[in-house]
């Protein structure tokens, strides 16, 4: 009884909003330590207690363990400035992901063939290879760097057995010169193509080149390949590029760097619909695979119909400029879902939605009903049903927006883990309140202080279903960490309560913004000007910022006398809240402000 009272007394210290926020992060696969740090709790013990009391673990158990691992891999992959511990955790998760898939294959083989029974005696973490009898002999010999001479096709069979139907179908169409695959999120495409390339490099000696939208995604390819080589073949791969003992090279390149066109080999282009300079990417990828023997494989979730990649997917770039091709029909979307088709331009196209993945055997990995509840129909269709965004009426250009995404590791004056992340440099805050139960957003913008600098979004925060008091306290904590000279708050409606509370501790910085057609137009034009002239940057890992901007459209008011800007409201883009939070921060900027140019000085020699 005493213990019960003690627990109750401890719980009462925290508002329901704090517990709700902890639950939200818990289900996103944050660790108790990370949740405590995120919410400013003194201890992680309440997290363990709440998880047990409110059965949060049961909610997680409804999802497959592989799905949970995949979610955590995504969370860590997108995290900037990862600590050594987080890097080790990411590598361990990839290791575990491969082991689970291998165990699943072994289970299937055990049921379907008695010959697989022998593998049941081996631990899932230390499973023997097909030729394990030679293992001790190999250890006695001097190891050759990246030696794959002992690998046989039979050793690949456990992996092949673990594939889902749609992955096997992609594998059976490996012979096509160009494969173009539009896919749902989290269906194991990176995982599969990593092994396909490794297998091909081992047995053919051909070079393999991975082109990814970011350095972090390229690292995922490499990590998968290193772990697979160790797990399936007992080989420790090192180097960048990785050069196998048979001479095959595996290159891992990001498109935000100066990619060398001197490399040649089979090309894998990852998430091509989100690459900022797609035309350059296409030129480089094609140049690397110019030789007749090289294959090209492109796969991505869809982005915008106005992104250059859409014409690559639709075949419009093949039709362009040739009257004879103008009316050549391409397979329908339904046909591409139905096993894929070889198209008139020579590309084999294939669509794998989450529904197709479930039918193909991945039903244990996903709970599609939970995903439909989590996302709006608009967001669900884009992320999981392979539907391109139609942003014809948007005031923003998707190509310009993608250029704003950068690798923030280059910002040497910003350390998000420090007590004072930006030192004493001036920053501006912007707050967009929650609407109808959706999330509130807060962003921190660093205005340029030196010639050549741009506006930078240092950080963003989203708070779901929380009270004014909680949100104001979160802003207070950030206010104490940064030299925040301005906090723009949408005080038109529900945000007024937050403004009143923030004003108590930041009277000079807090600024109430009353939304009307004139004020909204001014703020939107300021942000539009920054994007158009490439004067604003944010982390390239913040993938939902671009869709948030693309939702902003120009239309007349109900009276028809005034033009204003509106956003199509969806759950995934949080009512375009990150866009309006940025607007509220940039409101501090004058429309007439121009970027400070770098001055060039020279000394005249009068002699």
UniProtKB/Swiss-Prot annotation:
Keywords noted in UniProt: ATP-binding, Nucleotide-binding, Viral genome packaging, Viral release from host cell
Domain of life: Viruses
Pfam family, any one: Terminase_6N
A Gene Ontology molecular function term of the record: ATP binding
InterPro entries reported in the protein's UniProt record: ATPase_terminase-su_N (IPR010332), P-loop_NTPase (IPR027417), Terminase_6C (IPR035421)
Keyword Glycoprotein: no
Similarity comment: family membership: To phage P2 protein P.
Protein name: Probable terminase, ATPase subunit
């Amino acid at each position: 009884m005493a213990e019960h009272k003690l627990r109750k007394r401890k719980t009462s210290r925290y508002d329901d909003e704090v517990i709700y926020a902890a639950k939200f992060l818990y289900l996103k696969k944050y660790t108790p330590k990370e949740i405590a740090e995120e919410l400013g709790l003194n201890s992680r013990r309440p997290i363990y207690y709440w998880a047990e009391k409110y059965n949060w673990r049961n909610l997680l158990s409804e999802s497959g363990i592989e799905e949970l691992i995949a979610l955590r891999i995504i969370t860590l992959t997108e995290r900037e400035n990862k600590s050594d511990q987080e890097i080790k955790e990411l590598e361990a998760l990839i290791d575990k992901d491969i082991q689970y898939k291998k165990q699943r294959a072994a289970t299937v083989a055990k049921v379907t063939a008695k010959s697989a029974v022998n593998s049941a005696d081996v631990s899932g973490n230390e499973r023997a290879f097909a030729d394990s009898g030679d293992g001790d002999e190999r250890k006695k010999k001097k190891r050759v760097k990246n030696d794959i001479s002992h690998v046989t096709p039979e050793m690949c069979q456990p992996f092949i057995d673990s594939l889902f139907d749609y992955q096997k179908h992609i594998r059976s169409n490996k012979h096509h010169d160009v494969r173009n695959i539009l896919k749902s999120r989290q269906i194991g495409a990176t995982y599969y193509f990593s092994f396909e390339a490794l297998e091909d490099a081992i047995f053919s000696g051909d070079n393999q080149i991975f082109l990814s939208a970011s350095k972090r995604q390229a690292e995922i390819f490499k990590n998968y390949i290193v772990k697979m080589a160790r797990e399936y073949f007992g080989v420790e791969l090192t180097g960048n590029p990785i050069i196998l003992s048979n001479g095959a090279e595996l290159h891992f390149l990001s498109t935000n760097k100066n990619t060398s066109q001197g490399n040649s080999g089979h090309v894998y282009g990852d998430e091509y619909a989100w690459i900022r300079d797609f035309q350059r990417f296409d030129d480089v990828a094609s140049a690397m695979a110019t030789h007749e023997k090289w294959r090209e494989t492109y796969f991505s979730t869809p982005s915008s119909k106005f992104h250059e990649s859409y014409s690559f997917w639709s075949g419009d770039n093949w039709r362009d400029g040739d009257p004879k091709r103008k009316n050549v029909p391409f397979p329908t979307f339904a046909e591409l879902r139905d096993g894929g088709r070889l198209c008139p331009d020579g590309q084999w196209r294939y669509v794998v939605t989450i529904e197709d993945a479930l039918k193909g055997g991945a039903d244990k990995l996903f709970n599609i009903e939970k995903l439909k509840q989590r996302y709006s129909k608009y967001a669900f269709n884009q992320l999981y049903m392979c539907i391109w965004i139609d942003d014809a009426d948007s005031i923003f250009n998707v190509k310009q927006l993608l250029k704003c995404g950068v690798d923030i590791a280059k910002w040497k004056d910003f350390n998000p883990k420090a007590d004072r992340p930006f030192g004493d440099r001036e920053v501006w805050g912007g707050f967009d309140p929650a609407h109808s139960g959706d999330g509130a957003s807060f962003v921190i913008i660093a205005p340029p202080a030196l010639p050549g600098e741009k506006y930078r979004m240092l950080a963003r925060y989203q708070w779901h279903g929380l009270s004014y008091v909680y949100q104001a306290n979160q802003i207070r904590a950030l206010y104490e960490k940064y030299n925040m000279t301005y906090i723009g708050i949408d005080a038109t409606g529900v945000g007024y309560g937050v403004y009143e509370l923030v004003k108590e501790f930041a009277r000079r910085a807090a600024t109430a913004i009353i939304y009307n057609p004139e004020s909204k137009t001014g703020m939107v034009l300021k942000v539009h000007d920054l994007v158009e002239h490439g004067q604003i940057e944010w982390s390239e890992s913040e993938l939902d910022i671009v869709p948030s901007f693309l939702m902003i459209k120009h239309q007349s008011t109900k009276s028809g006398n005034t033009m204003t800007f509106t956003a199509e409201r969806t759950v995934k883009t949080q009512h375009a809240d990150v866009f309006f939070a940025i607007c509220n921060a940039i409101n501090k900027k004058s429309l007439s402000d121009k970027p400070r140019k770098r001055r060039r000085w020279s000394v005249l020699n009068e002699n």
